[in-house]
Amino acid sequence: MIYLPDGVQDFLPEEYKFKRKIEEKFREVFIKFGYQEIMPPTFEYSDNFSVLFDENNLYRFFDKKGNILALRPDVTTQIARIVSTKLKGSFPLKLCYVANVYRYDDPQVGKMREFTQAGIELIGTNHEESDAEIIAVAIEALKSVGIKDFKVDVGQVEFFKRVVEDLELQNEEINLLREFLQQKNQSAIEEFINDKGIRGKKAKFLSELPLLFGGEEVLKRAKELYDTPKLGETIDYLERVYRILKDFGMEEYISFDLGMVQNLNYYTGIIFRCFVKGIGYAICTGGRYDGLLGIFGEHIPATGFAISVERSMLALQKQKKDIIDKSWRVLIKYKENLRSNAYKKATLLRGEGKIVEMYSYEKAKHVDENSFDEIIDMEE
């Protein structure tokens, strides 16, 4: 068999150089904001993941002792475990990572079964400054690799939760409504409203919920449509986060989507997704997950995000943006008796940051000299 299974890919030298450069730039931004890099294991006990992920989406296997293990589908869950068991102490704690994750999803353009995420986690704070910082770091990371024409859609999990609480819906109805909102399927929502006998202000608000996306004016519109104390608190929080981002000069990147619901069920507060113009899927997702560490025994607030490196590559390729610095390539051709001198010269040039290949004259006959910027002959 010479073919690959669905959902994985090879990265050839130039592609991999491109990918590594993106990872390096993301990592550099994270570190400059005070985040320390961490690397959890590639696989753990399946139970550590199955509490949040459907087992059908995990790559699971047995070890020789009969334990059920799984390749990590997510790094945030691992960091929650690590902080709860090994990093108790002073907070806030700032951690970052660049790591491959594995999910048994249906492969499609921009969605693989093995992919690389670059992300950060800010643990131990639960105020608007930390949520604003997370969004700001995501924006700075995308800017650092040269991605243009992107927007960060910001929502709030509590917004949806408080709407369904007010409507007194059952779990099955909540899941159905969540699916309709994910699809922005307004006709299905209208049908849902009629079937459930929802009337008046609640019906009007619910029918407009998938349309509540755009600029700062969306928050004002939401208050006008359905002004309750609980929803008012949620909107006020979003307004405070937005004011901080305006102080950072980032308002041009921010939009709001109050009908946003996320697939990962560990989010508890603010959520966001980054979209690039012309690409129909998010390249970055994040939000607050104050309940996740409690699964591992420590009730500590936290927020973070993950950027898809492969989707960032696709965005840059679509925008025809090249971020690879061209290295100066040198070919040294030498006589056999000058091999020592040739190697010393090559070492000197490599110390200057140049790429150097050296071949004896006999071997150099088979080398494509056009691929080099400089050729040095060492004949005497």
Curated annotation (Swiss-Prot):
It comes from the Bacteria. It is found in: Cytoplasm. GO terms for biological process: histidyl-tRNA aminoacylation; L-histidine biosynthetic process. InterPro entries: aa-tRNA-synth_II, aa-tRNA-synth_II/BPL/LPL, HisRS-like_core, HisRS/HisZ, HisZ. One of its GO terms (cellular component) is cytoplasm. GO terms for molecular function: catalytic activity, acting on a protein; histidine-tRNA ligase activity; transferase activity. Pathway: Amino-acid biosynthesis; L-histidine biosynthesis; L-histidine from 5-phospho-alpha-D-ribose 1-diphosphate: step 1/9. Its main location: cytoplasm. Disulfide bonds: none annotated. Keywords: Amino-acid biosynthesis, Cytoplasm, Histidine biosynthesis. Belongs to the class-II aminoacyl-tRNA synthetase family. HisZ subfamily. Required for the first step of histidine biosynthesis. May allow the feedback regulation of ATP phosphoribosyltransferase activity by histidine. Heteromultimer composed of HisG and HisZ subunits. This function is generally fulfilled by the C-terminal part of HisG, which is missing in some bacteria such as this one. This is ATP phosphoribosyltransferase regulatory subunit.
